[in-house]
Amino acid sequence: MRKLTYTLTAATLALMTIVLLRAQDPVKVDSKHYKVLFENDQVRVLRIHYAPGDKSPMHQHPDSVAVFLNDQRAKFTYPDGKSEETSAKAGEAKWTPAGAHEPENVGDKPLEVVLVELKGKVEKK
């Protein structure tokens, strides 16, 4: 019984480590696509640029607001292996809850976004 408990604990810790290593700060793991425009104690503002077909490694963001600078199509793959395609029009702004993903520009034009990451806890009303 102890051996089974030990094995399950070790497997759980290994899985958690893999997930944490895969979901990292996008600026650190993909500086080609993510640039910091502004940062203070409350927010970090990122400029995101993907050429057609570009893909990023798995990373995570806190709660954020995305402002789309052009019409675009993207595919997001999540840590559980599921994926979804999304589209946005130039000038749209969307709330994006905290989470990890692996984005890919599946459109035929560059993908340009300004992402405002919130550093504090978001109060639910």
Model-based region annotation:
Residues 39-42, 80-98:
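Short acidic-glycine-tyrosine-enriched beta hairpin
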Residues 21-23:
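Boundary at the C-terminal end of the N-terminal hydrophobic targeting segment
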Residues 71, 98-121:
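Ligand-binding loop in jelly-roll beta-barrel domains
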Residues 1-11:
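Bacterial N-terminal signal peptides that target proteins for export
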Residues 9-19:
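Bacterial N-terminal signal peptides
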Residues 30-57, 62-66, 116:
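A short glycine-rich, His/Asp/Glu-containing loop-to-beta-strand
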Residues 61-80:
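Glycine- and acidic-residue-biased ligand/ion/polar-headgroup-sensing regions
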Residues 53-56, 92-104:
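Histidine-centered metal-chelating micro-motifs
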